[in-house]
């Protein structure tokens, strides 16, 4: 803490904690200015034990102040001595008396404030040192640091706990710092500064003695600070709430004022508008009409220009798009033509290579084998076999057991039930009434419940509950709902009872077996009839070959490569046509007014015909050869057809020989070999001789 000594013009320092404190005496001189200007000051000791730096009044050692500090108010309070008068520098005694008067007034006000506050730990700051020049104050010894500075101090001027006060200043940085007399001297003497509560604590003699025993700066110890009382905390909380309310009130007040100002502006604008409308004249209306017409014409012109611009841009874009489509279409057609041309060239190359390597005959044989009836018959038998059906069931079960397939099936089934049963109970009643006349033994419970025969008990129970809710007489007001419910109940009785359900399943299996056997017999009979109607006898292999009816008219049956058109055909005409770029040759014949494909028969006969010729190369007459006659003759109408003869022999197990002359029940004629062999055994009775049946041997199809 620093204070001014009016008797001297120098800087006095009071030491605490090994340091020195500076005070100004005389006029208020800034320490920074002194540190740079007073380079030749001497060091002395004051009578009260303080160290003083005497300032020489030599003008050579003192730098004159800058006059700009006195003329420009933005530089803050003046530093150093005042501006020089006309006669030179001001008198030192007058300056000291004026400053001491100001300091006395400030110290009195501070003392009065401290007494009102009631805090005994704060002492007033006197304007002048009372112990100045008093011999009663003993001089202290040197400090413990040994730097030669005096450890004695004036307790009226400063406090040894100044370091702790500085720490308190940092702790309470939101409060006003203490004003020193050097700062008070800068305040104009015409105005009285407001008194402020001092936050620095000045210790008494007992506190100083106690603090002298321990080092306040000792490391490892906590520094004690003044604690706020509960009253101060409560007062702070109350002040905080009041301040918040005040701020909210101010904000609301200013918002209300701004709202009133805004409303006033709008009212003023409306008033101006009404006033301007009242001042309008008839000529103003004409001018307004003219102005509207001008702007309407301008807007119309702008709209017309914009429409023309948009239409032109649209047509240009559409034209570009159409051109682009044409170009893309041309490129696609070109690419397609190139692709087809490459395919044709590649196919021709492969055909030529196959002809040279001899693969053409093998390829034709492979195609004919794939289209052979033996392969189709084998595939049919494979599909009808039980292992194949079990394999298909296992595959279907595994596919349905997949998680995503099961979820999709469940969703579809739920939606179907919800849409078909819950929404349309009348249709369910009508469906059940159609089965009301069916006897209970013949009733199909699964069909009644609308589920599959492989449904589980849970699914059956769920279906029964859903249907019972819809067709029950208490729920459905249909006049015949009771009959429908009886049908449903009968089906449920069959399914719910395990014994009755087992009996029904066995009965159903027997019926299915019988129906399946009958169906197999009928299907086989139908196939035999079709085969008998669509087969041809072969004199080369003594077998039969199938023929296929073609969807062609006799008037346009034959294709001619020379004319590139279809020519008419006559009964018995036999020709050939090529397909698949000449790899496959098909043989046709006109029989019974229909065109048939007889490729199998022609292949077995090894007939070589040039395909797609203009004239018919062969003419077929279906008949039997008569010994002793040359050529072919038509069969007599008395003998039955060969196909029907073979069909009847297969059904009734009769050899085809007895039917050669048209008599189905005629006795068999002995063969040419039987006459020679029967002569030695002529004594054998007639009833013991049993004729041998000839078995018809089918030879495999050969190309």
From Swiss-Prot:
Listed Acidic residues bias regions: 89-102, 164-176
Localization per record: Endoplasmic reticulum membrane
Annotated region (Disordered), positions in chain: 1-150, 164-229, 622-643, 659-703
SUPFAM superfamilies: Chaperone J-domain
Membrane topology: Multi-pass membrane protein
Tissue expression per record: Detected in heart, brain, lung, liver, skeletal muscle, kidney and testis.
Transmembrane segments: 254-274, 305-325, 327-347
Superkingdom to which the source organism belongs: Eukaryota
Ranges of compositional bias, category Basic and acidic residues: 203-218
Protein name: DnaJ homolog subfamily C member 14
Lineage: Eukaryota, Metazoa, Chordata, Craniata, Vertebrata
Encoding gene (name): Dnajc14
